[in-house]
């Protein structure tokens, strides 16, 4: 009897504790996890109350670095920084060759170059130009701009070719109207014409001054007085005349003198000299279309050698 009563009291106490635990769990639901019941059934069930989270533990060891990500796009440049202090002065520069180099073959001669041949000079625009220098004739220092010696080069050319120049350093050439203009625009230049016939007789003609205008003025010839020469004067007639070629007729004739006499020259109406005519090797039956100098050997004789050259006066 007493035993049954004790069992009943114990069961009631257990049930009361269960209700109190559930009530406390509900009250703490906002801060702690839910109550969890485990077991099978009846009085065998166990009530587990999960406590509130404890204090954070100590940090764990640092993990290994991950792999590098892809490189991002380059951003816009930032604003320029402030200028730094001036740097030290550089070493003195070398003078440009065109400022100190020779301008003519006469300059070369004055600097001790006594051998005739091809040399480099510098035009007023600092452009280098390789020219044939005659250091032997009449005191030397002559710049040769026209040479005929063997007929190896055709001189019956168009305007553009005469403008640029043509021929060979080994033989015949025309230096080019642009180059002749640049050479004679530097100051007063005297002109010498040397002629040799097929019997090796020499003739020459000298003029006090010689200048060729630029292309805009059709390479107009500006010639000074005839000074001397065994060949006589066959160029004054052409003074103040424009240059003409087979494709650009600037003469005073109704026809084209360059075509009629197969050359290129400062034709008037038409010529008394034609040093850029055909290489006809001495006496020829055709009229005035050879390397002719009328006051020398007339219209029907073509010279073996012709050279035109300038030197500062």
Swiss-Prot record:
GO terms for cellular component: blood microparticle; collagen trimer; collagen-containing extracellular matrix; external side of plasma membrane; extracellular exosome; extracellular region; extracellular space; serine-type endopeptidase complex. Residues 51-92 form the Collagen-like domain. Residues 76-89 have a biased composition (Pro residues). GO terms for biological process: cell surface pattern recognition receptor signaling pathway; complement activation, lectin pathway; defense response to Gram-negative bacterium; defense response to Gram-positive bacterium; opsonization; positive regulation of opsonization; proteolysis; recognition of apoptotic cell. Residues 96-313 form the Fibrinogen C-terminal domain. Residues 51-99 are annotated as: Disordered. A carbohydrate binds at residues 241-242. One of its GO terms (molecular function) is carbohydrate derivative binding. Ca(2+) binds at residues 249, 251, 253, 255. Expressed by the liver and secreted in plasma. Residues 1-25 form the signal peptide. It is found in: Secreted. The modification Hydroxyproline is found at residues 77, 80, 86. Gene3D superfamilies: Gamma Fibrinogen, chain A, domain 1. SMART domains: FBG (SM00186). Its main location: secreted. Keywords: Calcium, Collagen, Complement activation lectin pathway, Disulfide bond, Glycoprotein, Hydroxylation, Immunity, Innate immunity, Lectin, Metal-binding, Repeat, Secreted, Signal. Disulfide bonds join 98-126, 105-133, 257-270. Pfam families: Collagen, Fibrinogen_C. It comes from the Eukaryota. Homotrimer. Interacts with elastin. Interacts with MASP1 and MASP2. Interacts with CR1. The fibrinogen-like domain (FBG) contains calcium-binding sites that may be involved in carbohydrate binding. Belongs to the ficolin lectin family. May function in innate immunity through activation of the lectin complement pathway. Calcium-dependent and GlcNAc-binding lectin. Enhances phagocytosis of S.typhimurium by neutrophils, suggesting an opsonic effect via the collagen region. This is Ficolin-2. It comes from Homo sapiens (Human).
